[in-house]
Amino acid sequence: MDGFVQEWSNLPRSDNGLHMDQLVGELPTDGGFEPQTRARSNTWPCPRPENFVEPVDELDSTKASNQQLADPQQAMQNANAAKKNSSRRNAWGNLSYADLITHAIGSATDKRLTLSQIYEWMVQNVAYFKDKGDSNSSAGWKNSIRHNLSLHSRFMRVQNEGTGKSSWWMLNPDAKPGKSVRRRAASMETSRYEKRRGRAKKRVEALRQAGAVGLNDATPSPSSSVSEGLDHFPESPLHSGGFQLSPDFRQRASSNASSCGRLSPIRALDLEPDWGYSVDYQNTTMTQAQAQALDQLTGSMADELKLQNDMLQQQGFSAASGLPTQPPPPYQQQQQQQQQQAQQQSQLPQGYTLNGPVSAPGYNTLQPQAQQQQQQQQQQQQQQQQPQCLLHRSLNCGCLHSTRDGLSPNSVTTTMSPAYPNSEPSSDSLNTYSNSILLDAASDNGSLLVQQQQQQQQQQQQQQQQQQQLSSGLEGQCLEALNSEQIDEFNLENFQGGLECNVEELLQQEMIYDGLLDINIPLPAVNTNATNVILTNNSTNNSSSGCNISAGVQLSCSQLQAELQLQQQQQQQQQQQQQQQQQQQQQQQQLLLSNNNNNNNNSLELATQTATRVQYTQPSVVTSPPSWVH
């Protein structure tokens, strides 16, 4: 340890740091240990002089690139040498982990080794791993061996026959020779995948170009993308409907407010004209084909529109119940009605459009006439219908004769007697409703608005009157139906002699049902005539009907309940007493049985004793008196 007393010499520093050769030369060697230039855990190979490449200046590289080699064979040899020298080398040599494992398995007699045996072979046969067999320094290379065993296809794992032992590792005879194939999934970004994706792109572009050329020959229009989309989606309802899109239809994606690529079913009309010109609304009239197409597109919009009451009642609908009061007219009548409406529309002035009405003479006179015709048709239909009884469901009912004068036919037919409750409105009638309502809603004439307001007020008043008449008529009808001759069978006055019942039996039955046991109530002997209850209907006083009950048997509800509770308590006590008595009887029986058993056992013992007893008898000895006795 005396070497450490020496002072360190000041070594010259360079730009690259300290020179290791000078540092090693200055270290003292008498301390008993060799100087180590790097740690033992560093397993990277030492730099070799043949692999060292000197840096080439830019001028030298440019000069060498300008010169041509005289001998091409020499160039090939130099390239091969460079390849050999540039190959990856490990600290133990040129062999990789997979090659070492292959040698280890091949050197075994059975051509198979466990993982621990492979570790032992590495430590024994490879000089680099001799001092790295302990657990601290073997973590890295053992992990590499396990990784190579599971990674390469040349090794196969075989289950060990013994329980609790590690598996065998063997060489795979089916593995390809040469460089081992890695068991790693290939990437999706391969050349084959790129070719396939390129073909799909070309097909899509060809379809788009063909659709654009077929539909737009020379000039592109805003509907080119629409037609292209229809070609890609042949199941679209726009194909089968025969609906042709006008150039005014545009995609919503072209607007700044939306990015959806759907079609807008709204015409691109300039609702807000620019300041430079005025819009001619007369040129924007719609043809009949376009109107039908719009009806087809709207579809279920007719259900959401507020249909007028008079037009609903014309086809058999009622505003009060919401159900059709009569079946829809046959197809021929519907065609006739549609033709009449078309004629009425044709009589309108030509300047009328959906966007706005144009004042013309004669239009105000047509509307009241049409309304009068509709009202006449409604009255005729209501007169044809007949009221129906609610109780008997028959037209020729006797209970309706008295109320038929007080009730109007409108109130009976619109709400009470649905002749065909399961019928539904047809789609053609709804379409005609929607067309007529659109025409009525578009009219802005002042006189029409005044008339409509008056009609609505009148209709509301009529509805209120009808509802009042219905409520009063229904009450009268029900009362008269109850008091009619057809249900006189249920009149209590017709029962002669009254209704008789025995109160004692009734009370006993009720108590039996409540208490679930037969209870005999000690009641005094009462004449049956006095205990009979006679129920008669007092004709003079219709508001109340009484029952004459004898005074001796009148009991209030509270008294009955109290008596029932007492009886139930008595029953419970009796049941408990009975149970106690039964238990006592059982105990007595058990005692008797035990006593009988004891007696039987004693008698058996006595019998056996008498049977086995031996009777000993003394022999009778006759002694004669002595001779000297006389």
Curated annotation (Swiss-Prot):
Positions carrying Phosphoserine:
S187, S255, S258, S259, S264
Query: Which gene is this protein's source?
Result: foxo
Task: List, alphabetically, the SMART domains matched.
Answer: FH
- What is the species listed in this Swiss-Prot or TrEMBL entry? Drosophila grimshawi (Hawaiian fruit fly)
Which CDD domains does the annotation name? FH_FOXO
Q: Which residues bind DNA?
A: 92-198
Q: Which cellular component terms (GO) are annotated to the entry?
A: cytoplasm; nucleus
Name of the protein in question: Forkhead box protein O
Cell compartment(s), UniProt:
Cytoplasm; Nucleus
